[in-house]
Amino acid sequence: MTNGNADTFDLVILGAGSGGYACALRASELGFTVAMIEKDKVGGTCLHRGCIPTKALLHAAEVADHTRNAASVGVKATLEGIDMTGVNSYKDKVVSTMHRGLTGLVKSRGITVVEGEGRLVAPDAVQVGDRRLTATKAVVLATGSYSR
């Protein structure tokens, strides 16, 4: 628990991608106070530029493919083309909806999100600009496959 200092938490997590937010959510379930530091958007590469947008685009391609092959199962349908503006709008809506849901969940769990680039400055502390966050239990490095 905190000791009265707003920048002291049980757990300080550097990175808010899939590993970081999963850790933060579980820690909050266990009653830990949690700060999560992110220089981009909560959800990381997977949600914003990787897994989720790719799967949304693949879903649109599968719909087009099924439409093109509909006659083979007795369904009369024609594929008149692919509207890439519409496909990208669909992808963006999927990402936006999931991001809103995730940020709402993080907020509802009382997790503090600190925007900025964090730097490990001690075994129990991370510096974000002029702000120093101290962890009483652990600092978790969840910066992805490589730091940038």
Can you name each region flagged by the protein language model?
Residues 15-18, 39-40:
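Glycine-rich Rossmann-fold phosphate-binding loop(s) that bind the pyrophosphate
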Residues 2-9, 26-32, 37-148:
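Glycine-rich flavin
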Residues 19-23:
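Short glycine/serine/threonine-rich phosphate/pyrophosphate-binding segments
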